[in-house]
Amino acid sequence: MKILVTGGAGFIGSNLALELERQGHEVAVVDNLLSGNKNNLKGFNGKFILADVAENFEVSDNFDAIFHQAAITDPRYPNDKETYEKNVNGFKNMIDLAKKNNSKLIYASTAGLYGNGKVPMQEDQEKDILSAYGRSKLEMDRTAEKLFNKMHIVGLRYFNVFGPREKYKQRAASMVYHLAKQIKSGKNPRIFKFGEQKRDHIYVKDAADATIKAMNVKKSCIVNVGTGIATNFNELI
């Protein structure tokens, strides 16, 4: 299949692009390199397009599937308005491209929509939005739901993803990454008070596998992507 990965120089996007290529697909990556890094794509043989999908993005190729990972993901990004508008506009542009080419569209949402909500977290539970990033993803999900009967569109609410190619996320990298970095440097790991806060941590290769499987779902949907296992920070270290 011919596949486009947006945000493909980022953390999940690069792992996804490399795995899709390993499986024999013809893959193109688009990234504006705002937070992604081409070093994440070492070994990638497909086309790289330097562009911002939130702007007037055009591509001449026809793709069978689009994996939309591009977004401002750092909840501490200083401009909430820009975070919301770029994320929502980029998604709408990918919807337009998918409609034009009759492509399957699989996009990154977030389990951050549940905030401090009840566990186990279910897709239909009340949302607890804590950031502009969360608001943008909720708007994307609402837009997707209106298209369920019109196109193949799948939203993936990732929980706490960790693994290779994460370091360029810097402060927005996972707690697993930061704890491992501190331990490797000989420092005592810094955790939240008492370290009893629980999170669902999923390895990036498992998240990529789940993302690829979304190409073959029978019905458009929005689903959680995690392990279903809550681990506290004390257990991590």
Predicted stretch roles:
Residues 1-159:
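N-terminal Rossmann-like NAD(P)+-binding domain of SDR-like oxidoreductases, especially those catalyzing
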Residues 2, 188, 220-222:
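Residue-level preference for the first positions of well-ordered beta-strands
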Residues 6, 110, 136, 198, ...:
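Ser/Thr-centric signal marking residues that sit
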Residues 9, 33, 195-196, 229:
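Structured beta->alpha junctions
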Residues 107, 190-193, 223-224:
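Short, hydrophobic secondary-structure boundary micro-motifs
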Residues 132, 142-199, 204-215, 230:
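NAD(P)-dependent short-chain dehydrogenase/reductase
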Residues 216-237:
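Mid/C-terminal beta-alpha module of Rossmann-like enzyme folds, strongest
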